[in-house]
């Protein structure tokens, strides 16, 4: 498979049989094979595209999100590829690896005090949004499109890949 757009390879991850390890018919979805390395690529793409479809996110706007890591990586991957300025806000004590990945994807990073946990990041996003109406805050923790991504995509893939043989 050759693709011009990395977003085309988010999702459609394989089902992996764990029978050799467990002796049972247990399967796992290989979401770690998404380009950002986690299931969060799928929800990031879904939340951003749903916001675009509703008109909540338009060209020229900035995508902002508070995260401790993997969702920020997914949002950076998707948002930057779609041409948006992406700003990720996270506590300063998150791993250097995550910070470097987010920056390498082209997103900006704002670090908040680790003593404020994720709440500090949420407050900073609210402060930034109040100053600039052209900021779209994803709000993964409250966003109904987050779980809907799995209902509309992950579940359908599992059903199809397992040919309906699920108990």
Report the location of each language-model feature.
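PLP-dependent amino-acid enzyme catalytic core
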Residues: 1-167
